[in-house]
Amino acid sequence: MHKEIWTIGRILQWTEQYFQSKEMDTPRLDGEVLLSHVLGKDRIYLYTHYDQPLIQEELDAFRPLVQQRAKGYSVASITGQKDFMGLTFKVNDKVLIPRPDTESLIEHVLDTYSEDCNIRILDICTGPGTILLSLLHYLPNAVGVGLDISTDALPLARENADSFNLTKRVEFKESDMFSALRGTDEKFDLIVSNPPYIRTGDAKMLSQDVLNEPHIALFGGEDGLVFYRILARECGAYLETNGRVAFEVGYDQAETVRKLLEATGQYSNIQFIADLGGHNRVVTAVYEG
């Protein structure tokens, strides 16, 4: 009996159609990334080897990844990696996957400070180290501390620091917001944060991809502002005079977060930074003490 031959081109075509039937947003791209991961090749290789037959071991490895994607797990959590700001982060389904929106915050900080600055950075809700490690990579004289309550996220953050050769310049600590710093005299030049900010009532509007990420990293209470209130209230205790804050916010939260900072009477030069979609995605301010 003639055995069916699955080439790279044929399996990609089948996968694209299958993902389309599941109403995936990027069916072709998802299939390409998953197959590239299985083969250990880049996506260009797929197009230059379209007629290459896949061996049984490759098909057996590919099938469960397709099934996971069909269940709504993100491609990044399936492959265990996500490219962000020119770096490849290790990720999994226990952490918030790095998103393009967050690049707006990092690019603003890099525009604010000179490349040779020797600032100290604190990252609250660091997750896999997305913001802090990206900044340290591009600011070679800076050092930083990353805090997170998740004992699942911190080992990944440390692995990423090791991958990027940053372990000597960064420390990660388990901490419920600022709890690990209370009672210390630590001061920082910059505090960054991408805290959970989705309103709990908005869960029904989220895609399955997002809902499969840890809810502790997504939801910021009924109004989405629980963690911004803590940041506004407590950042000043750990900032040098004229230090700065930079927070990622939900697409409609910038004005409210500005008011929270203003209400402390400690901040000036409060600004919004828009993302590529034109939404104010970052709130920054200078601490005056």
Regions inferred by a protein language model and the residue ranges of each:
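Conserved hydrophobic residues forming the short capping helix/wall of the S-adenosyl-L-methionine
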Residues: F19, A161, C235, L261
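Conserved SAM/SAH cofactor-binding pocket of Class I
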Residues: S104-K204, D209, I230
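Short loop/edge segments at beta-strand edges and connector loops
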Residues: E174-S175, V249, A274
